Amino acid sequence: MPQSVNGHANGGDLERIAVKVGQKIHVILVTDIMYIQSDGDYVQIMTDQHNYIKEETMKYFETNLPADRFVRVHRSYIVNVEKILRIELYEKQSQMLTLKNGDKIRASASGYKALRTVLNL
């Protein structure tokens, strides 16, 4: 069974995330998330359609998102493995992930190791 970076075999079972934007609350399905990026005391949740900002920690998402689908590939990024198009060598100790929407994310050596485990590489 794949291990996430946090050591939990299955990770969490979070299915949706509520984000308040002004007077509205948007409900995001985790399957729609491309990646999550840390931004100080907040995180940016990137989907195909929109980018959302939420006051939450990366550790919270790392623990609560499904570990077979989401991997922390860098201290600043958690990626949905189903949204990865390509993985390429970037520098000696890192890889560059190209997502289906064209965004590029650098994976650290430990993040790439965790990604390889989830992808069975």
Question: What residue spans do the PLM features occupy?
Answer:
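Conserved binding/recognition cores within well-folded domains
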Residues: 1-100, 104
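Short, basic/aromatic-enriched C-terminal tail that caps enzymatic domains
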Residues: 110-121
